[in-house]
């Protein structure tokens, strides 16, 4: 499957799962009309467009992602949103970096992809206005459902998939955040949302799209899929529902401190 198809597949699945969790989290982050926001790791832009709606025409959202195919899909999908721009970028290279440009930097399920988190926090700090804040939603461990899916549906690729992730404990994230100069406003765990898939093909597509194509859908035989769904889903037939109960992800909101950072 091509990278463009992967990006489109990501758009189709993220429109539900990640947007649902992201919207819930944004109630705490509280973007305001007129805000300038950086959406760091925007994917195909579903939450970016929602942020643009929240800040209104007097505000602006700059959305960046290192995956150019996802950026192209985002640009084509949200052409009518005039206060939103999509650009290729990363945690170490984004518009306005180091220039105190943004009121909020939003980062939704991106932290586990970034090896150098200390650099990320320093870059975010220097890119916020004096009254700015960051709003991060992240996983500090491999979610249980994902771990089962990778090991049972794609055992041939499990090591490659694990090596893609750079999880950090919540306490470790908080420590790096404070070291960069932030004051933590809120840091808490949230129950992971349930996952529902219309059929087996949507399960294959979901894990393929969310691993940048490393998860191979062609290795998911009907026997593997049936066994997986029988073990973990609720009910006997499609749509397949997998409960998030007992699993969690983390959220962090932190404000730019007026105090100087020693050694910063």
What are these regions (language model features)?
Residues 1-35, 46-50, 69-73, 77, 135-157, ...:
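Conserved class I S-adenosyl-L-methionine
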């Amino acid at each position: 499957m091509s990278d463009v198809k992967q990006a489109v597949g990501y758009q189709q699945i993220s429109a539900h799962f990640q947007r649902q969790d992201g919207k819930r989290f944004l109630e705490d982050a509280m973007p305001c009309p007129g805000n300038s926001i950086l959406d760091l790791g925007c994917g195909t832009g579903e939450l970016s467009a929602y942020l643009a709606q929240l800040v209104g025409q007097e505000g602006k959202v700059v959305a960046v992602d290192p995956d150019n195919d996802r950026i192209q899909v985002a640009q084509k999908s949200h052409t009518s949103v005039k206060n939103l721009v999509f650009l290729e970028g990363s945690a170490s290279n984004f518009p306005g970096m180091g220039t105190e440009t943004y009121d909020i930097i939003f980062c939704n399920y991106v932290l586990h992809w970034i090896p150098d988190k200390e650099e990320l926090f320093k870059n975010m700090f220097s890119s916020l206005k004096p009254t700015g804040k960051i709003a991060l939603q992240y996983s500090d461990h491999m979610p249980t459902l994902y771990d089962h899916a990778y090991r049972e549906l794609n055992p041939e690729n499990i090591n490659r998939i694990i090596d893609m992730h750079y999880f950090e404990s919540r306490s470790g994230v908080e420590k790096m955040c404070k070291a960069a100069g932030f004051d933590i406003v809120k840091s808490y765990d949230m129950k992971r949302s349930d996952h529902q898939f219309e059929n087996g093909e949507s399960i294959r597509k979901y894990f393929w799209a969310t691993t940048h194509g490393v998860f191979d859908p062609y290795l998911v035989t009907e026997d593997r899929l049936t066994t997986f769904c029988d073990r973990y889903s609720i009910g006997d037939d499609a749509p397949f529902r997998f409960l998030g109960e007992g699993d969690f992800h983390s959220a962090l909101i932190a404000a730019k401190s007026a105090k100087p950072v020693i050694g910063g």
